[in-house]
């Protein structure tokens, strides 16, 4: 029996994780849950899974949750300290890190320091503080298992092979809803259009990131830290069908890929059950029915966010943290209809240009950079 804490339990990844747990009550048990927005949904999860402790966004949410609780009454915490408490609970074997954005960094670090294995869906943790997290993972001898479908695919495609035999890793991207949209038409993109992803059902922030290709850029940086790959050995190819989740090319010219239906329950189930496998509940792949798989190069002129991510990775230091923080502010502004679609990448680039990078050592230094970038990005809002 593997005991889990889920950070971000009411979000897209959290809900999919709980669906996998429902299918395998004999393999997984829920010890802790943390969420930030939907107290009513958390109350229902508490009733069903009976965790020992939970955390919510703030004191007001904690009070509201107490009023909604039924017969089962777990310990209730709140804030980032509360999420960190859930991440480090005694008796937890694995923490599913699925809080959206840089807010997931502190509780993920707390989990690692407490010796918990990590199923990582929060890519921002590695984008912001990849060097720190990698060092802590090695120091505390925990497993860092990717939940993103692309990184899970690479993880599986690397299994059993020597690192020195890898020529490059290739991340696939759906291309988002605007793959065929002209640069001129992108100026008129609406929020509603950007929120309609052609393949995946996800939360609002990551859906916008997928539309700008910033999500793929963040995944490039995440892949660098997960697999110890330099930027020049990480490629991106657009694959609209989202069936091949990513690939590894070896020095002999052979390419190993992982295929599957576009359903996050598959990489989640793999991370939860690793090194074994378990049923995920997804539809089995029918290649004859799919018939055609296509590929094309990403257009970094129309989608400069991907270029900015590569630039940040190559520059190193605190640039990836600045990229991420500025993007979070810009996407939030777009979701509030304060800026246009193309303004997202423009705000990120201006913030990066205003930054002088350095190499942080401690967590608080990374968080200070994150705060600086957010404050600076806000100065570029209309």
Swiss-Prot record:
State the pathway, as annotated in the record.
Isoprenoid biosynthesis; isopentenyl diphosphate biosynthesis via DXP pathway; isopentenyl diphosphate from 1-deoxy-D-xylulose 5-phosphate: step 1/6
Keyword terms of this UniProt record: Isoprene biosynthesis, Manganese, Metal-binding, NADP, Oxidoreductase
Record: residues binding 1-deoxy-D-xylulose 5-phosphate: 123, 149-150, 174, 197, 210, 215-216, 219
Q: What residue range is the signal peptide?
A: none
Question: Which cofactors, if any, are listed as required?
Answer: Mg(2+); Mn(2+)
Q: Is Metal-binding a UniProt keyword of this protein?
A: yes
Q: Where does NADPH bind?
A: 10-13, 36, 122, 124, 203
Enzyme Commission code? 1.1.1.267
Q: Which residues bind Mn(2+)?
A: 148, 150, 219
Q: Is Manganese found in the keyword set?
A: yes
Q: Which reaction does it catalyse?
A: 2-C-methyl-D-erythritol 4-phosphate + NADP(+) = 1-deoxy-D-xylulose 5-phosphate + NADPH + H(+)
| Disulfide bonding pattern of the chain | none
Task: Name the Gene Ontology molecular function terms of this record.
Answer: 1-deoxy-D-xylulose-5-phosphate reductoisomerase activity; manganese ion binding; NADPH binding
**Entry's Gene Ontology BP terms:** isopentenyl diphosphate biosynthetic process, methylerythritol 4-phosphate pathway involved in terpenoid biosynthetic process
**Which EC class is this protein assigned?**
oxidoreductase
Family note: Belongs to the DXR family.
> What does this gene product do?
Catalyzes the NADPH-dependent rearrangement and reduction of 1-deoxy-D-xylulose-5-phosphate (DXP) to 2-C-methyl-D-erythritol 4-phosphate (MEP).
Protein name per UniProt: 1-deoxy-D-xylulose 5-phosphate reductoisomerase
């Amino acid at each position: 029996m593997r005991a889990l804490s889920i950070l971000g339990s009411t979000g897209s990844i959290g809900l999919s994780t709980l669906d996998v747990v429902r299918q395998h009550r004999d393999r997984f048990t829920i010890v802790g849950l943390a969420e930030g927005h939907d107290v009513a949904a958390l109350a229902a999860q508490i009733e069903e899974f009976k965790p020992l402790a939970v955390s919510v966004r703030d004191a007001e949410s904690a009070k509201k949750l107490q009023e909604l609780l039924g017969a089962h009454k777990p310990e209730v915490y709140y804030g980032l300290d509360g999420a960190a408490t859930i991440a480090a609970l005694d008796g937890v074997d694995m923490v599913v890190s699925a809080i959206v954005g840089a807010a997931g960094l502190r509780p993920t670090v707390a989990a690692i320091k407490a010796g918990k294995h990590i199923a990582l869906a929060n890519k921002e943790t590695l984008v912001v503080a990849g060097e720190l997290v990698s060092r802590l993972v090695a120091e505390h001898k925990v497993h860092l298992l990717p939940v993103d479908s692309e990184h899970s695919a690479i993880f599986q495609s690397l299994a059993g092979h020597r690192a020195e035999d890898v020529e490059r890793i290739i991340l696939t991207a759906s291309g988002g809803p605007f793959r065929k949209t002209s640069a001129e038409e992108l100026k008129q993109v609406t929020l509603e259009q950007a929120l309609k992803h052609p393949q995946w059902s996800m939360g609002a922030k990551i859906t916008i990131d997928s539309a700008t290709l910033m999500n793929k850029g963040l995944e490039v940086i995440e892949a660098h830290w997960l697999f110890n790959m330099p930027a020049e050995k990480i490629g991106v190819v657009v694959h609209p069908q989202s069936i091949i989740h990513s690939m590894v090319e070896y020095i002999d010219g052979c390419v190993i890929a992982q295929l599957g239906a576009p359903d996050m329950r598959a990489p989640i189930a793999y991370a939860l059950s690793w090194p074994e496998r378990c049923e995920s509940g997804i539809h089995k792949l029918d290649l004859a029915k799919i018939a055609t798989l296509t590929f094309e190069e990403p257009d970094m002129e129309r989608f400069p966010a991907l270029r900015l991510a590569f630039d940040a990775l190559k520059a190193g230091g605190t640039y990836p943290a600045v990229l991420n923080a500025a993007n979070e502010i810009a996407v939030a502004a777009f979701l509030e209809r304060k800026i246009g679609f193309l303004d997202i990448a423009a705000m990120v680039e201006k913030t990066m240009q205003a930054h002088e990078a350095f190499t942080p050592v401690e967590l608080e230094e990374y968080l200070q950079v994150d705060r600086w970038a957010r404050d600076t990005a806000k100065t570029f809002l209309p």
